[in-house]
Amino acid sequence: MSNKKIFLIFYNQLLLIFGMLCLGINVIHCSAETTRKILPYKSAMINYSKPIKFSIYLPESDDQTDKYPVLYLLHGQSQDEKIWDQMGIKEIADHLISTGCISPLVIVMPREEAYMEKISESDFGNRIINELIPYVESNFPVLTDPASRAIGGISRGALWAQKIAFNHYGTFGLLGQHSLPAAVFSDYVIYRIYADSEGKIPLMKIRIDSGTEDPYLKGALAFSKQLADVKAPYMLVIEPGGHDPEYWKEHLEDYLIWYADNLKNPAND
């Protein structure tokens, strides 16, 4: 089986399974295309009762010491992390890497279980920062420099990506806003974030895109205006399409090219 695999990781807090893993016993379920591992995880800071699930794309490598830039991609409302597989992210990434169009990268796709919950009341963003990122960086071959770490999302996932990236400005080098439904922060908050970080934290690269028929196009334009008002650099792409998987699938290759081209990769220096 190719080393290019998408792993579905289940976090849990069962001491029994943790003990098995400490003894070198893995609980693994295999299929023809993917390998799924059940692994325990417990935050050192916060004890959550519900598990986090995520899929991860790992590029093929002959050198086990290789480390790669990492991209965190967040799905939209009424979806889960399987949407990325359904849109062909593995095949697209494989093709781009194998043809030399992009450098290899790791792609992490977490599931938001309570996607109907108000973002303002959800702990999902904190769990990404406090649990998921530390776990990924401890268990997978990823670079830990913020310039080598990106976050992006589609629809509600774009809202989450913006909230996480700006609440923790300096944690990510790139932010992708794909079909952003609305501006997350007030104009003043955006102004303060950039003013407070000026000269201290490298500017985050931002790509915003939306379809011409997207009913939420105004969200992308509103965020673009906020950035323009504070003279923050960004890329705005408006192309034919709506607010749906067909639009995202059509542009998924463009997304991966942008992330890979802008993520810092010492192997390319």
List the predicted regions and their residue ranges:
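Bacterial N-terminal signal peptides
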Residues: 12-26
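Non-catalytic cap/lid and distal C-terminal segments of serine-dependent acyl enzymes
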Residues: 31-269
